[in-house]
């Protein structure tokens, strides 16, 4: 599964560069805010040239991450589809100043501008992590423009810290304190597991002594760097191991884990999470999902911290008219890092069902 040699030859002849082995066409979308300020949005189109039904807009997570960590996820299918990725407002290649210009409404309307610039009547959205909340918001604001949704590592349609999300009344009306406690216990187990993974890898890499345990409590990289006299390179390595241990089930591919650090702008997360409109809108996305008649495909790992098990998504999809859940065993939040073949197969099915297009088209 992957890009054909003939396709690479064709792209090389056309002069398009490649990134992560995938042909890419980069451009900037220029928009003007209500106050007259200009924003240049970085856009990167990966894969084939535009053809009817082959375009998928991909929404990265964060809030405040950027697009490139998702390139390995779409690479096996870039011989069939045109994936349009972009850095959302405030993210790495789409800077805005001040952060006050970042809002949930602005992020949704930037996506609508992108749809218009691409000349598409309807769009298929593939979202990862908090990108799912952007997909939900777009569906709420522009339901007539959505052809289908592919929700990867899908954050549930609820605000953070909401102890009684709107959807519970529909999918789990008898959700009780014991259920909340059980969910909290699953998260505690997950935390112990990723810390164990971190320790095993860090010991193997010589960053920590062989007898290391969390006897001091789990310490930050700053504390560990001081305790074990790490160099900046050591500390960066430890951070990447931690990032991988949290986002994958195995942690084995930590050297290939993309994103984080300078690729993440926490100001974006702060701006969106503190935006009153976001809090209001996120309470209204569940009704929008229930009313949507297009295909919704949810792909999640069994060890994804956004919904461990999963617990909530098996119930949620029963209330969305044309929804289907694919659960991938032994995979975390970055599913393609743990189980690349299984993820590629699930994504191919989801794309065929949401776009109506297959490799033979």
Predicted segments with their positions:
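A catalytic-pocket lid/entrance helix-loop region that shapes and gates access to the active site
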Residues: 148-206
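Alpha/beta-hydrolase
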Residues: 186-299, 307
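Conserved loop-alpha-helix segment in the C-terminal half of the alpha/beta-hydrolase fold
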Residues: 286-328
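Conserved acidic catalytic loop of the alpha/beta-hydrolase fold
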Residues: 105-123
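Conserved hydrolase catalytic core segment
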Residues: 121-167
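Catalytic active-site module of serine/aspartate enzymes centered on a nucleophile-bearing elbow/loop
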Residues: 323-361
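N-terminal cap/lid segment of alpha/beta-hydrolase-fold proteins
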Residues: 15-40
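Conserved HGGG/HGGXW glycine-rich cap/lid loop of the alpha/beta-hydrolase fold
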Residues: 39-96
């Amino acid at each position: 599964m992957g890009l054909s040699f003939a396709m690479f030859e064709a792209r090389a002849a056309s002069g398009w560069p490649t990134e992560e082995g995938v042909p890419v066409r980069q451009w900037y979308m220029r928009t003007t805010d209500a106050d007259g300020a200009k924003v240049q949005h970085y856009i990167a189109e990966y894969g084939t040239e535009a053809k009817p039904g082959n375009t998928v807009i991909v929404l990265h997570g964060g809030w405040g991450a950027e697009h490139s960590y998702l390139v390995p996820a779409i690479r096996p299918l870039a011989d069939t589809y045109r994936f349009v990725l972009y850095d959302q407002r405030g993210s790495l290649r789409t800077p805005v100043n001040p952060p006050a210009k970042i809002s949930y409404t602005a992020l949704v309307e930037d996506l609508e501008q992108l749809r218009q610039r691409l000349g598409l009547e309807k769009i298929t959205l593939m979202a990862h992590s908090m990108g799912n909340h952007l997909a939900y918001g777009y569906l709420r604001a522009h339901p007539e423009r959505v052809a289908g949704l592919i929700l990867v590592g899908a954050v549930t349609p609820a605000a953070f810290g909401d102890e009684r999300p709107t959807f519970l009344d529909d999918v789990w009306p008898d959700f009780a304190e014991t259920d909340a406690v059980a969910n909290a216990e699953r998260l505690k187990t997950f935390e112990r597991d990723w810390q164990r993974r971190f320790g095993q890898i860090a010991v193997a890499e010589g960053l920590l002594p062989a007898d290391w345990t969390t006897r001091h409590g789990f310490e930050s990289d700053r504390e560990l760097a001081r305790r074990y006299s790490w160099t900046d390179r050591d500390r960066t390595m430890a951070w990447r191991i931690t990032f991988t241990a949290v986002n994958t089930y195995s942690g084995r591919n930590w050297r290939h884990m993309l994103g984080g650090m300078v690729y993440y702008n926490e100001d974006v997360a702060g701006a969106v999470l503190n935006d009153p409109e976001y809090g209001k809108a996120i309470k209204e996305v569940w009704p929008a999902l229930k009313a949507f008649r297009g295909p919704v495909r949810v792909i999640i790992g069994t060890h994804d911290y956004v919904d461990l098990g999963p617990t909530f998504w098996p119930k949620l999809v029963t209330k969305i008219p044309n929804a289907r859940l694919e659960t991938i065993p032994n995979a975390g939040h970055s599913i393609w890092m743990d189980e690349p073949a299984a993820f590629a197969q699930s994504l191919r099915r989801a794309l065929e069902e949401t776009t109506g297009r297959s490799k033979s088209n």
